[in-house]
Amino acid sequence: MSAKFYICRHCGNLVGVIHDSGVPMMCCGQKMEALEPNTVEASGEKHLPVVTVEEGAINVRVGSVNHPMVPEHFIEWVYVQTEHGGQRKALKPGDDPSVTFCLGDDKAVAVYAYCNLHGLWMTEL
């Protein structure tokens, strides 16, 4: 099962689904919009997660060219989907656009990065 994320276009709330019962996600009295990765017209070289796998961990850098990390334009979070669940790490302006996830014996299957301007980006592993 792939990860699912939704956004409220009214207030900006973001939701990551743990269990999908099929009921529409609602916020501010309206249906939330499903985020589809890699669909916004923007530079993939600055948005696609670049992943290196090491024993028990993965390192993720957002972009083959570092993504900007300024208040107007930054990566808000990175999420790694694994065979048994997932992990998320938050970033803020001024941070380096890279994170490390310790996975133990779990296996990563996809990595997502969310840009405050250009939406959701994903690399399948």
Name each region found by the language model.
Residues 8-11, 27, 115:
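Short cysteine-rich clusters marking metal-coordination/redox-active sites
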Residues 62-70:
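Short amphipathic, basic-aromatic surface patches that mediate peripheral association
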Residues 5, 24, 112:
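Residues immediately within or flanking Cys/His clusters that coordinate Zn2+
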Residues 17-21, 35-38, 123-125:
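Short Cys/His-rich "knuckle" micro-motifs
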Residues 107-117:
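Short, aromatic- and glycine-rich surface loops/edge beta-strands on solvent-exposed regions
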